[in-house]
Amino acid sequence: MGRAYQNRKDSIAKTANAKSKVYSRYGREIYVCAKQGGGDPDGNLALRGLIDRAKKDQVPAHVIEKAIDKAQGGAGEDFSPARYEGYGPSNCMVIVECLTDNPNRTFGDVRNCFTKSKSKIGAQGSVAHSFDHCAIFAFRHDNEDEVLEAMMEADVDVTDVEFEDGLVTVFAPNTEYAAARQALTHAFPDIDFEADEIQFLPQVTTSIAEDDLPMFERLMDMLNDLDDVQNIYHNAEH
């Protein structure tokens, strides 16, 4: 799991390097999270994790505060999540997560990205079964057994725990995100998460043929340019 996770982080670093795009994506996600679960991070663990992630990605405090204030104001856009799946160059599998106020527009925009990169958008569930939908927490700790014990005491279902050079990475089903985070912060009050998120991790990878690489990069670039796109997951290796 760790390798796929690291590939994903490397992909983010390469493709989501425009600050304004990063701010916009976090702003929209924080707005939706605060609107759904409340604007108090102490009572909304998903929001707390999201704010911590945003700060680590150097999103300014005013961007975070504005999104929460907007959510608590009651008015504003009505964003809903949308997920699209398909096959890219070399038959790699791609999942695109969006937050949209116009699903028809967003579907058309995403489909256009696939079409113009010799790729094919598929039906819901066409590739998601080949990914694990995971909650992932990474942090510095010198005792793997203590982490496992904390998870067991809280009755959290853990998929995997990796320990390497003092870095512990806990993988759990996405539905266990809140319980796992609460268990970790309760057991280790000074915990500083290096990763705290929910992702789709591929169960197998697909090598991109050299001739297909330009089209794969075109697909990623076009999707990243869409305002409604929040996350892109794939199983490509290149």
Swiss-Prot record:
InterPro entries: Integrase-like_N, TACO1_YebC-like_2nd/3rd_dom, TACO1_YebC_N, Transcrip_reg_TACO1-like, Transcrip_reg_TACO1-like_dom3, YebC-like. Belongs to the TACO1 family. GO terms for molecular function: DNA binding. The keyword Cytoplasm applies. The keyword Cytoplasm applies. NCBIfam families: PRK12378.1 (NF009044). It comes from Idiomarina loihiensis (strain ATCC BAA-735 / DSM 15497 / L2-TR). This is Probable transcriptional regulatory protein IL0164. Pfam families: TACO1_YebC_N, Transcrip_reg. It comes from the Bacteria. GO terms for biological process: regulation of DNA-templated transcription.
